[in-house]
Regions:
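Alpha-helical/coil-rich non-catalytic "connector" segments in signaling and regulatory proteins
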Residues: 1-110
Length: 110
C-alpha cells in the first residue's frame, strides 16, 4: 500500500463543491476551507473521538451528543485536537436548525 502525499488530497472547499454537498452551508470556520481532507468519517457513536484520524472530515447528525450540552460544546475542540479537516453536522433531527451560534463561534476560533 502506498501513502499519498497530503498535497494530493482535496481541500475541504473542493470536497464541499461535490454534488453530494449541494445545499450545505458553511456556518463557521471558513478560514479552514483550505485544509486537506484525507478521508471521511461518518459517526454518531458516543465514543466517536476514538475512531477519528488526522485529516478526516467528520460528518454527524449529533445523535449521540444531542442531550448533552457539554458534549455538544466539546465536539469542535475535540475535532481540532484530533487534527480533523472539518466537521459536517446535519441539523434538524437531533441538533437544532439552525445550529447554535456558539458552534459557529467556536469553529471560527479554531
Amino acid at each position: 500500500m502506498t501513502s499519498q502525499h497530503t498535497a494530493d488530497y482535496p481541500t475541504l472547499q473542493e470536497v464541499l463543491r461535490l454534488p453530494v454537498f449541494a445545499g450545505c452551508t458553511v456556518c463557521g470556520g471558513a478560514a479552514g476551507l483550505g485544509r486537506r481532507v484525507s478521508g471521511v468519517n461518518l459517526t454518531d457513536t458516543p465514543d466517536y473521538a476514538r475512531w477519528l484520524a488526522q485529516g478526516e472530515l467528520l460528518i454527524t447528525t449529533g445523535f449521540s451528543i444531542a442531550d448533552d450540552p457539554q458534549a455538544i460544546r466539546g465536539l469542535l475542540p475535540t475535532a481540532a485536537e484530533q487534527g480533523l479537516s472539518g466537521v459536517g453536522i446535519k441539523p434538524g433531527r437531533y441538533l437544532p436548525n439552525p445550529l447554535p451560534t456558539e458552534l459557529a463561534e467556536t469553529a471560527d476560533r479554531l
